[in-house]
A protein has these predicted regions:
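Short beta-strand and adjacent tight-turn residues that come in two discontinuous sequence segments
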Residues: 114-115, 220-222
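Short solvent-exposed strand-capping/beta-turn motif centered on an Asx-Ser/Thr pair
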Residues: 290-292
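Terminal disorder- and signal-encoded targeting elements
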Residues: 1-131, 137-139, 144-145, 149-150, ...
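Short, ordered loop/turn segments at secondary-structure junctions
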Residues: 118, 177, 224
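Glycine-rich, charged/polar anion/phosphate-binding loops
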Residues: 205-206, 226-227, 269-272
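Extracellular/periplasmic Venus flytrap/periplasmic-binding protein
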Residues: 175-190, 194-220
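A short beta-strand structural signal in non-transmembrane regions
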Residues: 283-288
């Protein structure tokens, strides 16, 4: 299927379904989708099938991402910290990430969620993605930014793809249909003048399988490095990470101001010894205006007062940088904690 036809399908479907339907979809909705194993709407069921129990006034729903990305394991570390330092219980839900999570925050089925800062901006302002055009999510509010969500273009050495220009005519997995990853991928390809490609749509783990099987030539992945699905792929295949640098990076940043410079360190993935220049968006914690100031401040304080208990993204998540790249209005509970 051509890239134009795939985008048309997405826009038509999005226009019909609207934002509300996103909360219930099972596809990957954002940069950190991975594989999803949802347990309903996230009210009381946790990813492993357990029940949170306890007082409903202290039970909070936290929507993460797919199990193959960074959002889900990081959210579970937040869960451990919050539950050890407050009276709140967090029900961490595996989801399709950013776009789906915005829908869940909008309808109140999620109290907190991890999303990309660009998707947050689109949703809050009713722009950027057809789903949000004229459907601004007015109750969406920010808590904290966390770490760069690196744009990783992964391929196998056997494809011969080494540069962005080599993607012309290729079969590319741009992420799940309607996801933040797909939005970012299409923005980047358009910005560098690549329009002739066959677009496939699937989550990170499935894209990894497609690469290994030779069904696609390259895949876009959006998430903090290292991404588990790419790590797994690199253990059994010779992978190549395509850089976004120089004039191409300048063109991408000119086309979309939320992209920032980023570098994947050499050695992050097996067989990729040199650093790879690319771009990134930001992962952030979001909530909705219906969550109390007390709950948001207490959860925020528990996390940022105990960052030494984290094992994921410890070089990036700090209280000092937690408002860098914040693209939407801050919740009053978060503002109280950060003194904004």
């Amino acid at each position: 299927m051509s890239s134009k036809e795939t985008r048309r399908r997405f826009l038509e479907a999005a226009g019909i379904a609207g934002v509300a339907a996103l909360a219930g979809c099972s596809g990957n909705g954002g940069g950190d989708g991975g594989d999803t194993e949802t347990e309903g709407d996230g009210g009381t069921a946790t990813e492993d099938g357990g029940d949170s129990g306890g007082d409903t006034s202290t039970r909070l729903s936290w929507h993460a991402g797919g199990t193959g990305g960074t959002y889900y394991p990081l959210s579970n570390e937040f869960k451990t910290i919050v539950e050890a330092n407050t009276d709140y219980t967090l029900n961490v839900q595996s989801t399709g990430a950013s776009v789906e999570n915005v829908g869940s925050l909008s309808d109140g089925s999620a109290d907190f969620a991890l999303i990309q800062n660009d998707i947050a901006y689109f949703a809050k302002n009713g722009t950027g993605i057809e789903t949000f055009e004229g459907n601004a999510i007015e109750n969406l509010q920010g808590v904290a930014t966390l770490y760069p969500e690196t744009i990783t273009i992964v391929t196998l050495e056997s494809t011969g793809i080494e540069t962005l220009s080599d993607l012309s005519g290729a079969t590319i997995n741009t992420g799940d249909l309607g996801s933040g990853t797909q939005v970012n991928a299409n923005q980047i390809l358009e910005a560098v003048g690549i329009t002739d490609y066959n677009e496939q749509n699937a989550g990170f783990s499935q894209a990894s399988e497609q690469l290994a099987n030779g069904d696609i030539d390259a895949a876009f992945v959006v998430g903090g490095w290292p991404v588990g699905a790419i790590e797994d792929l690199a253990t059994t295949n010779d992978v190549n990470i395509v850089s976004i640098e120089g004039d191409n990076r300048a063109a991408v940043k000119d086309a979309a101001s939320w992209f920032a410079d980023d570098t994947i360190p050499g050695g992050t993935y097996s067989g990729v010894s040199d650093p790879v220049e690319t771009v990134a968006v930001q992962a952030m914690i979001a909530t909705n205006s219906g969550v109390s100031a007390e709950a948001v401040e207490n959860v925020t304080a528990a996390i940022f007062d105990n960052l030494d208990e984290l094992t994921i993204k410890t070089d990036f998540i700090t209280a000092d940088s937690a408002q860098d790249g914040m693209s939407i209005e801050l919740h009053e509970g978060a503002a109280a904690y950060f003194g904004e």
